[in-house]
Regions:
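N-terminal type II signal-anchor transmembrane helix
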Residues: 1-56, 735, 739-747, 751, ...
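Intrinsically disordered, low-complexity serine/threonine-rich repeat tracts
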Residues: 205-210, 219, 226-285
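Extended amphipathic ligand-handling, pore-lining, and cofactor/metal-binding catalytic surfaces
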Residues: 603, 709, 718-721, 725
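Outer-membrane beta-barrel and related beta-rich outer-membrane complex signature
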Residues: 136-138, 375-377, 447-451, 609-618
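Solvent-exposed beta-strand/coil patches in large extracellular/periplasmic or lumenal scaffold regions
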Residues: 146-175, 197-203, 207-211, 215, ...
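Generic short beta-strand segments
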Residues: 57-61, 84-91, 129-131, 166-171, ...
């Protein structure tokens, strides 16, 4: 009995002591001034981060009952930690001393999961977080921490169930990309479905497109995008109907299991766009569409600053912080940003945002000129008129091997449509751009900026500072060959119809553009025009300075009647133009290439009619004045015109330059200087038999392309004004023989012209031999 009593008393003492200890611990925990522990906490966290850490305000610890727990677990309280004025320091080399500052932070910690080596934070809230990110030119950055390394993986796991904050800012400075950005972030108040954001962005972006390419162009762009989206939606509905009937049950179950159904941002985009298109066309349905149950946005942001020295400002939206941790769900993002004169908008999803796995976005792009994208992206594109595009951007991120596809996009460039797919591949030593582009209706004027031949107003609009000299015709704007070495390209382009004027359509334009290590080639560049074909090749080597170029042109069966459809005088013409050119040159602009060109240019024109009005319509100032001097206002039938110029370092010398009419045989001699765009030509008319011809003295054409001067050379009669071109040659037309019947084996009415000049050449050769 004594032993039992002793044991009982001992047990009572033990229980009492434990109770006292628990009570004392409780009193200690609830009454302890945790600010005394701040030095120890600061020291431990600083050591773990490898950066200075400090709690400059109060540190408090409280206790509360857990949420969502039942049974005895509901009686195990959670510690609740609060701190104010927290900061993490930056490395010594950083421009600012603080990496992160928080006005306040509060989080709970679940106790029981600690027994299983799991840190569960039911909720964390921060107030006014500010993050400062910086990267130097040598690659050092402030967001890389030097944590203690361990050869063994940590047995601990971390889980965050809820995260909230009010108003945060992120500053980003990058010496490599020349970025200096400030991003303000805040909660949206309530989640916004991706589909709702898509519809809003679609309307906003199409209004922006109208500002660039006009309301009509934007409407055509929208109609085409809506039609394709409706087609995609119809295909999706058909597939869904087949699946619901049981034909594809297994596939549907597999898709559901892998989470592919509804995970694509483009699927949401297509469905939304199709709905808009259906509504616009007046279609109605009794069923009320269900609210999208896909990804939602939780945060809004505003960005301002500079990127690659280009001014940046815009807005955006992001998914919740917890969604970042879930690799099985797409993370939504949206942005509408203006960079200089370029505007970019995206709506879609990011897969595994912690590791930047992939993107699937709807993208809108508008700008003054596509060449301006080079500064932002490093992608070399030509100068263009204002443009707007809309399409799907998909991409996969890999270290130094990322790939992106702008898929099935539609666009407007000036007054032309443009569509297709472009792929960008990150690789060494240079990235590569490839794809196929198609234009159903291409305006000829929209091609002028590509070679710098657009108007001064157009150049000013796209920001080109090159001034075309007032006395020069050939474009002096230089090729940006330094950009050619930044990117390789393999792009095929088809223009189904190219319009210079409504009466002269060019059809079936096709070119294959290849750029490799600064060497650009268009082989071939061909199209149909005026019932014939024009085939060219261009090879531009920009790998060194100056640029080296090689060009060939072959014109076949260009019908005069179709070439000048608005000129009545030509409607009775049955002839055509055939020609060839082969030139090589060096220079960094079209004018410089012309000034150094070497090669040959030859052409035959047969069975045509010309008038002074035709010369004016063609913009041939010199020819117009010469025509008036020779023929007055009369229409003239051209039996044959033959041209064969030899180019030597920018000097064009005519081997043959002759014109055969019913009344006269006219030949031209003298050089054309492409270096200074000057002329020194003499035009010699020779009457046929006793036919009356008003002018028997030769004419001269001097001056420049821009300011030509034409007059009568009264010092010599036509019959004594030097022999016809080629009289010292055995057969000056030998080089033109291939053009007489290029492919159709029809006779060309040039026999009289050829015969007369060849006869005179033979007479002169015989006279020389007899001396």
């Amino acid at each position: 009995m004594t032993l039992t009593r002793a044991i009982g008393k001992s047990a009572a003492w033990v229980v009492g002591i434990v109770a006292v200890l628990i009570a004392a611990a409780g009193v200690f925990l609830f009454t302890f001034d945790w600010n005394r522990a701040k030095p120890w906490v600061n020291e431990q966290v600083s050591a773990a981060l490898g950066r200075p850490f400090a709690i400059n305000g109060d540190l408090k610890v409280g206790w509360r009952r857990p949420d969502g727990e039942t049974g005895w677990r509901a009686w195990v309280p959670w510690p609740s930690f609060s701190a104010t004025q927290l900061e993490i320091g930056n490395p010594d080399w950083a421009k600012t001393p603080k990496f992160v500052t928080l006005d306040a932070a509060h989080f709970d910690l679940a106790i029981l999961p600690l027994l299983a080596h799991e840190i569960v934070i039911p909720s964390i809230d921060v107030v006014n977080p500010a993050v400062d990110l910086e990267r130097l030119a040598d690659g050092r950055n402030t967001w890389t921490f030097q944590f203690k390394q361990s050869s063994q993986p940590s047995p601990w796991k971390v889980r965050l169930d809820s995260f909230g904050f009010a108003k945060g800012t992120v500053t980003y400075r990058d010496a490599i990309t020349k970025a200096d950005l400030t991003v303000a972030i805040d909660t949206l108040g309530q989640p916004i479905p991706l589909g709702d954001v898509l519809k809003e962005q679609e309307q906003t972006s199409r209004e922006a497109s109208a500002q660039r390419v006009g309301k009509r162009g934007a409407a055509q762009l929208s109609a085409k995008a809506n039609a394709e989206a409706a087609s995609s939606a119809s295909a999706a509905q058909a597939a869904s109907a087949a699946a619901s009937s049981g034909a594809s049950a297994a596939t549907s179950m597999a898709s559901a299991a892998t989470g592919t159904a509804g995970s694509s941002a483009s699927s949401v985009a297509s469905a939304s766009t199709a709905a808009g298109a259906s509504g616009a066309s007046g279609a109605s349905s009794a069923a009320v569409p269900a609210k999208p149950s896909g990804p939602t946005y939780a945060f809004g942001l505003k960005v301002d600053g500079r990127y690659k020295n280009v001014p940046i400002n815009g807005t955006g939206k992001l998914g919740g912080v917890l969604a970042i941790q879930d690799t099985s769900r797409p993370f939504p993002l949206q942005a509408d940003v203006k960079a200089g004169d370029t505007r970019l908008a995206i709506v879609g999803t990011l897969t595994d945002p912690m590791h930047l796995a992939a993107i699937d976005l709807r993208m809108w792009l508008q700008g003054t000129s596509m060449s301006h994208l080079y500064q932002l992206t490093g992608i070399t594109l030509p100068d263009t008129p204002p443009y707007a595009t809309e399409g799907r951007l998909i991409g996969n991120f890999k270290r130094k091997a990322s790939t992106f596809r702008y898929e099935n996009f539609n666009g407007r460039v000036g007054g032309s449509d443009l569509g297709g797919t472009l792929a960008y591949e990150q690789r060494e030593p240079r990235p590569k751009l490839s794809g196929e582009l198609v234009s159903n209706l291409l305006q000829f004027s929209d091609l002028a900026p590509v070679i710098g031949a657009d108007t001064a107003a157009s150049k000013a609009k796209r920001g080109d500072t090159t001034r075309q000299p007032p006395d020069r015709v050939l474009p002096v704007e230089t090729f940006r060959t330094d950009r050619w070495r930044a990117l390789d390209a393999d792009v095929k382009f088809t223009g189904r119809k190219l319009v210079k004027s409504s009466n002269l359509p060019i059809t079936n334009l096709y070119t294959h553009i290849v750029m490799q290590d600064g060497v650009l080639s268009l082989e071939p560049l061909q199209f149909g025009v005026a019932g014939g074909t024009l085939a060219t090749t261009a090879h531009l080597d920009g790998s060194g300075a100056p640029l080296k170029g090689r060009f060939t042109v072959a014109a076949r069966h260009l019908k005069l009647k179709q070439l000048f459809p608005t000129q009545k005088v030509m409607q009775s013409a049955l002839g055509e133009i055939n020609g060839d050119a082969s030139l090589s040159a060096t220079g960094n602009s079209p004018a410089a290439l012309a000034a150094t060109s070497t090669g040959e240019v030859k052409a035959l024109v047969t069975d045509g009619r010309i008038s002074r009005l035709l010369m004016e319509a063609a913009g041939l100032n010199v020819a117009n004045v010469v025509y008036e001097k020779l023929f007055g206002n009369n229409d003239v039938k051209i039996n044959c015109a033959a041209i064969d110029f030899v180019a030597t370092n920018g000097m064009l010398d005519p081997k043959v330059f002759a014109l055969d009419t019913d009344d006269a045989l006219i030949n031209v001699d003298g050089p054309i200087n492409l270096r200074d765009e000057s002329l020194d030509l003499k035009i010699h008319p020779h009457t046929k038999g006793f036919r009356i011809f008003s002018l028997r003295s030769p004419l001269y054409a001097k001056g420049t392309f821009k300011n030509p001067k034409v007059g009568v050379d009264a010092g010599a009669l036509a019959l004594r004004a030097g022999a016809m071109i080629g009289l010292g040659l055995i057969n000056p037309f030998a080089a033109l023989i291939p053009l007489i019947a290029p492919s159709n084996n029809r006779d060309v009415p040039c026999s009289e012209l050829f015969g007369q000049i060849n006869a005179k050449a033979a007479q002169k050769a015989a006279a020389k031999a007899g001396k």
